[in-house]
């Protein structure tokens, strides 16, 4: 299997994301007003967000999340299976994507469909990605974390540059149909984030229903739910030692980066993210 599928200069996982599907998403897929789109750069808390949104839709009833796999509940639009599922689906759709803005369906930008964009400290994204991609057959294997830091800073990782992904999608942050969430805030005040999502979606949940959403979307419960923990992922795609839900914490990068790596990262971050208001990002 090749290291990546390259499309428009961006590396994508080598399995399940053909160029034809990427072209179709960009040029043919029609976003409907009632769709809800969950956007993230990989390893930013995507599955946690999906779980919370699914539980909000069922008012905390866990039957759906315990009986249907996460990739069937909210298909990844850029995968061949997800795309086929979404174009056949009637009614409102829950859509997941890691796509950069310029490769997403053009129809989104003239639509009132709601978008939730979740971002996470890129240092933690990097460490999580290093462990995740390294234990799959979906991407090129780095020989060390140091190598992966270099690749990440150059955008030579699945879905390309974190910096470009964030800069582009954040251009929508003032729109009424766009909700920006931070992984760090979700960890610190999960209930507050759940309520924020409810408000954005116009969903009114009772206190006991909100408690159920919180309970069934917890890290421990998700880790034990085979519909959400990727235990059902195709075995040829994973290597020994693979674990999808590793630790779900914030600040883990401090246990991995050397001082030199942290300084190199900070330098690139300052350059690439220049122009955003102070306090825009809630991490150190």
UniProtKB/Swiss-Prot annotation:
Catalytic site: 98 (proton acceptor)
Intracellular or extracellular location(s): Cytoplasm, Cytosol
Binding-site residues for 3'-phosphoadenylyl sulfate, renumbered to this chain: 43-48, 120, 128, 183, 217-222, 246-248
Cited Gene3D superfamilies: P-loop containing nucleotide triphosphate hydrolases (3.40.50.300)
E.C. code: 2.8.2.2, 2.8.2.14
GO CC annotation, single: cytosol
Induction record: The ST activities display gender- and age-dependent alterations and are known to be under the regulation of gonadal, adrenal and growth hormones.
Pfam families xref list: Sulfotransfer_1
Single GO biological process annotation from the record: sulfation
Comment on pH dependence: Optimum pH is 6.5.
InterPro entries: P-loop_NTPase (IPR027417), Sulfotransferase_dom (IPR000863)
Tissue expression remark: Liver, exhibiting a sex-dependent spatial localization in the lobule of the liver.
GO MF, any single term: alcohol sulfotransferase activity
UniProt catalytic activity: an alcohol + 3'-phosphoadenylyl sulfate = an alkyl sulfate + adenosine 3',5'-bisphosphate + H(+); glycolithocholate + 3'-phosphoadenylyl sulfate = sulfoglycolithocholate + adenosine 3',5'-bisphosphate + H(+); taurolithocholate + 3'-phosphoadenylyl sulfate = taurolithocholate 3-sulfate + adenosine 3',5'-bisphosphate + H(+); 3beta-hydroxyandrost-5-en-17-one + 3'-phosphoadenylyl sulfate = dehydroepiandrosterone 3-sulfate + adenosine 3',5'-bisphosphate + H(+)
Keyword Lipid metabolism: yes
Broad EC category: transferase
Protein keywords: Cytoplasm, Lipid metabolism, Steroid metabolism, Transferase
Domain of life: Eukaryota
Subunit structure: Oligomer.
Its biological purpose: Sulfotransferase that utilizes 3'-phospho-5'-adenylyl sulfate (PAPS) as sulfonate donor to catalyze the sulfonation of the hydroxyl group of hydroxysteroids and bile acids. Prefered substrates are dehydroepiandrosterone (DHEA, also known as 3beta-hydroxyandrost-5-en-17-one) and 3beta-hydroxy-5-cholenoate, but can also catalyze deoxycholate and its conjugates, and lithocholate conjugates, in vitro.
Family: Belongs to the sulfotransferase 1 family.
The protein's name: Sulfotransferase 2A6
Taxonomic lineage from the root: Eukaryota, Metazoa, Chordata, Craniata, Vertebrata
Gene this chain is encoded by: Sult2a6
């Amino acid at each position: 299997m090749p290291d990546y599928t390259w499309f428009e200069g961006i590396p994508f996982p080598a399995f399940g994301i053909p160029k034809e599907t990427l072209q179709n998403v960009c040029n043919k897929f029609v976003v409907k007003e009632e769709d809800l789109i969950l956007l993230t750069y990989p390893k930013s808390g995507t599955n946690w967000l999906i779980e919370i949104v699914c539980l909000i839709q069922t008012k905390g009833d866990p039957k759906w999340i315990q009986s249907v796999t996460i990739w069937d509940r909210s298909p990844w639009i850029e995968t061949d299976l997800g795309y086929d599922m979404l174009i056949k689906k009637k009614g409102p759709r829950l859509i997941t994507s890691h796509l950069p803005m310029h490769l997403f369906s053009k129809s989104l930008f003239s639509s009132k469909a709601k978008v939730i964009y979740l971002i996470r400290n890129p240092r933690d994204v990097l460490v999580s990605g290093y462990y995740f991609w390294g234990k799959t057959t979906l991407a090129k294997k780095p020989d060390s974390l140091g190598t992966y830091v270099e690749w990440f800073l150059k955008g030579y990782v699945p879905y390309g540059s974190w910096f470009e992904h964030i800069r582009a999608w954040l251009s929508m942050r003032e729109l009424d149909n766009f909700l920006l969430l931070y992984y760090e805030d979700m960890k610190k005040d999960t209930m507050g984030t759940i309520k924020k999502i409810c408000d954005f979606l116009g969903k009114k949940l009772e206190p006991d229903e909100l408690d159920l959403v919180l309970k069934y979307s917890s890290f421990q419960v998700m880790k034990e739910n085979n519909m959400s923990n990727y235990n059902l992922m195709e075995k040829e795609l994973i290597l020994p030692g693979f674990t999808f839900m590793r630790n779900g914490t914030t600040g883990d990068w401090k246990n991995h980066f050397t001082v030199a790596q942290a300084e190199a990262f900070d330098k690139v971050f300052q350059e690439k993210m220049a122009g955003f208001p102070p306090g825009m990002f809630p991490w150190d």
